[in-house]
Amino acid sequence: MVYEFASTSKVTFPGAGISVMATSEANLAYLVPLINIQTIGYDKINQLRHVKYLQNKAHTLALMQRHAAILRPKFHAVLDALDKEIAPLGIGAWKRPVGGYFVSYDAMPGTAKRALALCKEAGVTMTGAGATFPYGVDPQDSNIRIAPSLPPVEELQQAIAIFCLCVKLAALEKLGV
């Protein structure tokens, strides 16, 4: 059973994007009756809004290039801080995303919730630890989704500096230092 899902939510209208699913014909035959129970009718006005906005493949690709130009400095701010402050200590791991809107950060196991609690105390609000897991339950308490798209670069630099400090403090507490 393989299902692939995608959405235009961050590309077009946050929280109002169009979603798509790709799967085999057998999986689709199983899933359609389940979806039909949940969906009375699709938001055709929203679909039309997307067709008019995205227009065609070339226009959509050009739009994504404009998004990349806006987001690139924000992602660099996050990744540069992680590379400088966290990488030498070996207390976290992350991948350099190729596209997308998030950096998935894996803290030392057992420290993600504490690190984010410290961030909140310092005035930095982030998506909850383990938010990418089903029901928000990360059995390792390590995953933090960093979403650098909203704040201006200057605010983001301040926030990621606080984040790095809080990750360090949570790791020290976990190690009993």
Each language-model region and where it sits:
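Short beta-strand segments
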Residues: 6, 20-22, 96, 102-106, ...
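Conserved glycine-rich beta-strand-loop-beta hairpin in the small C-terminal domain of fold type I
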Residues: 65-79, 91-106
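A common structural junction motif
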Residues: 39-40, 121-127, 164-172
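PLP-dependent enzyme catalytic core of the Aspartate aminotransferase-like
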Residues: 137-177
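Short, solvent-exposed loop/turn elements at beta->coil junctions and helix N-caps
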Residues: 7-9, 91-92, 130-135
